[in-house]
Amino acid sequence: MSQKPSIIIASVLKPVDDSRMLYKLGFSIRETNKYDLNIIGFSSKKTPKVENIRLIEIFSGPRTNLLRLLVPFKFLRKLIKIKPGVVIVTTFELLPMAYLAKRFLSFKLIYDVQENYLKNISYNLTMPTYLRVLAKWFVGFSEGLDRGAIDHHIFAEKCYVSEMPDIIKYTVIENKAAISSPFKPSFQLPDPISPHFIIGGTITPVYGVIAAIEWFLKLNEALPEAKLSIIGHCPLNSFYKQLTRDYEAAKGIQLELSDQPLPAAQIRNKVMEADVLMLPYQLLPSIKDKIPTKLYEGIALQKVILMSQNPLWKSIVDKYPAGMCIDFKAIKDVKSVWKSLLNLDYYRIQPDEDIFWEAEKRKFQQLLINITCPD
């Protein structure tokens, strides 16, 4: 019996149990029963045991830790040991070592482009100016050093097609919801007196958290029993301190912040307990053309969604309807928005294939067939 070819999915920025790496790409590979799968990444807060998938942690600690510079060399050692047939790199930092290793290991290299890092660095303002210049150079160097060595690109967003026009060999595989929930008939908000709002995921300034909190506090003046839960990974220590200093004692607000990524299931369970999912993203050039995974997942769970005003997102929210898109900074409109939310009949149309991972899974599985058996 011939041995299954090995596949590696690797990241520095994402934990080994990252939603896309493990539950979407990883489970889609495992389902074929054709490959020996290894997922390499950041140390998870609680690493799960997953049947027939090997989870390999090659970094832990703060992202600013200098030991992170050694990760590409650890990655190279794993490549030499495993001798994969296919390597899927999901962060730019590992590309130079992948280029080098490919010369003598002859694997197929796929770059899963989950972010437009150059745009993120320019607009998300998560680092000082001098570091942004250095980071942009390193991204450009890593992604462009030997682009011809990349056999195929995966774009996690449709907008990357126009943002990266020089890339010709690509497949768009969007980050849709890999979860299912029994369909509920159309409903209205169940609790008009003490609604439970939630913000979950990666908690950063560009997520629009501050504007959403201030919006909620204004609503809380009229609805004193309302509450807002904020749960997730807060990677910027300065922002963590700001949130805890300014809002930890605020009426109706519950903070559950971590300096490490939290398991997706933990956040999802909290979202399911809430009445309204808030997605208050700032409309930056690095964000406005993307479709947040949280939007897909919120609709899959049939949650009421309150989201930043954006024509792209509004077209999705209005379809079912799943909620409303608003200007979170328009505090004066809080009462009228709440009245509109109470009067809406949600999910008159059932969440459909536009929301779920299933179609993306088939595209990904076909891509692997094309890459490993090109004839």
Say what each PLM segment does.
Residues 7-10, 188-220, 228-229, 361:
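Conserved donor-binding/catalytic core segment of Leloir-type glycosyltransferases
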Residues 9-24, 89, 204-210:
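A short, glycine/small-residue-rich beta-strand->loop->alpha-helix junction that serves as a flexible
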Residues 27, 73-80, 96, 100-104, ...:
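Membrane-proximal helix-turn-helix segments that form the acceptor-binding/catalytic region
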Residues 165-167, 171-172, 176-194, 208:
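Acidic anion/phosphate-binding donor-loop and adjacent secondary structure
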Residues 207, 261-270, 275-297, 307-315:
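Nucleotide-sugar-dependent
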Residues 232, 241-269:
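Nucleotide-activated donor-binding/catalytic signature segment of Leloir-type glycosyltransferases, i.e.
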Residues 329-336, 342-373:
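A charged, aromatic-enriched C-terminal amphipathic alpha-helix characteristic of glycosyltransferases
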